[in-house]
Amino acid sequence: MANKTNCIRNGKKYYRLRVDLGRDSNGKRIRKTFYGQSKKDAENKLEKYKNGLNSGLTNDYDKLTLGNVCKLWLFEKVKNTIKPSTFERYEGIYRLYVKTSPLYPIKLKDLKSLDIQRYYNDLFNSGKSSSVIKNLNKLLKSFFNYCIDEGYIVRNYCIGKSITIPETSSVDENKKDDITVFTLDEQNQFINAIQNHRLKALFLLDLGTGLREGEIIGLKWNDIDFKNCTVSIKRAIKGVTLIEGNKRQYHLIEQTPKTKNSIRTIPFPENLVPILKKHKLQQKEEQIKSGSAYTKNDYIFCTELGLPIDPRNLRRSYERVLKKYNIPYKKFHSLRHTFATRLFENGVPLKTVQMLLGHSNINITANIYTHVMPPEKFKAIDKINSIFDMK
């Protein structure tokens, strides 16, 4: 039997649907209330709830905890709808900041925004950065949207003024502290250091295009247009930990680039053409030498057996060059930052840099590189060939 009424909750109008769902395992009568923006909305939530009973949820709705439902949502609902690398990040947030948190055992019916705010404050006071808390809040916001759709809660505790993310007093903690670039002297020192390196072409192409690590590893020969000096980014190689049950295993996977804007065709310095062609000849020699042990994947940059390069090994190889030639340490990603910085130093427009880097919007580019953007009128992209002195 259902009782349908209009009501006001938290200052907002809802349609309320109360139903009798029988009795629980102790013989106690179960009455459940669903809220919706309309009668149809509330009825849909009731139907979803009933369907959920067949997928592991119990009639004892009041016993559902944030942790148990979040785990079910993440591993059964979300996992197969996102990239493996994205799921790896979500799972890490869940494992580190939900699974062992004081929020985990709280029943959804008892959850308050104050519980979440208190936990965020504790994380911040224990030394966790604002960015960590923002990422956690983003995950919980998506989770609570799911809970609303299922009728477990009526509002999202992570939206609006309910929650305040603790902030540091430092300016833009996520960006400026992480931006390190090669000076012109260091850039030239690095270029000289890799002249006889097996991955010389990779390092120079990255310095001359600003590709992300996974993007440059994922390049294939048919992505290169030698005539027009362009490279098309269509895929990325990622090292991810895949989770099946209680097992965690590291794999290299090929997936689409980071965002839609990351799928792009961009120019590269024309003085890299002979370097890339020489690299291709050396690759063919490795193929002949390896014989049947060689795997033909058409990757521009691969192991001596034709397999994709593990990002971890690429970083190690890069870092060995820095150490051997006493070049101040910088992350591999600094090649990308150096590319962008050189463009700004030479007056290339912000919008053009955004397009070349594949950022999803221009604000990302502006926020990262504000400190190097010149105040004078921007110039055209054809400067790219003169900026980098590739040898």
Feature locations, PLM:
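N-terminal core-binding DNA-recognition domain of tyrosine site-specific recombinases/integrases
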Residues: 34, 74-152, 308-313, 328-334
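Basic, Lys/Arg- and aromatic-enriched nucleic-acid-binding interface segment
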Residues: 134-138, 149, 153-219, 226-227, ...
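Catalytic-site neighborhood detector that most strongly recognizes the C-terminal catalytic loop/helix
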Residues: 237, 273, 338, 357-383
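A short, basic/aromatic helix-end/turn motif that makes direct DNA contacts
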Residues: 218-224, 354-360, 370
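N-terminal DNA-binding module of tyrosine recombinases/phage integrases
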Residues: 10-16, 21-114, 279-295, 374
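Short, basic/aromatic-rich helical patch in the C-terminal catalytic core of site-specific tyrosine
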Residues: 17, 116, 140-144, 216, ...
